[in-house]
Amino acid sequence: YKDQGLEILAFPCNQFG
């Protein structure tokens, strides 16, 4: 999900946020 930046999926450490 790092490519999509989905913080709502419990992935706040993605590229977008």
Swiss-Prot record:
Query: Is the keyword Oxidoreductase in the record?
Result: yes
Instruction: Supply the enzyme class, top level.
Output: oxidoreductase
Question: Biological process GO terms, please?
Answer: response to oxidative stress
Stored Gene3D superfamilies: Glutaredoxin (3.40.30.10)
InterPro entries assigned = Glutathione_peroxidase, GPX_CS
Entry keywords, A to Z: Oxidoreductase, Peroxidase, Stress response
Give the Gene Ontology MF terms in alphabetical order.
Answer: glutathione peroxidase activity
Reported induction? By water stress.
- Record flagged with keyword Oxidoreductase: yes
Q: Which reaction does it catalyse?
A: 2 glutathione + H2O2 = glutathione disulfide + 2 H2O
Task: List the EC numbers from the record.
Answer: 1.11.1.9
Task: Look up the further comments and give them.
Answer: On the 2D-gel the determined pI of this protein is: 5.6 to 6.7, its MW is: 20 to 23 kDa.
Give the family per the record: Belongs to the glutathione peroxidase family.
Name listed for the protein in its UniProt record: Glutathione peroxidase homolog
Name the source organism: Pinus pinaster
Q: Species lineage, top-down?
A: Eukaryota, Viridiplantae, Streptophyta, Embryophyta, Tracheophyta
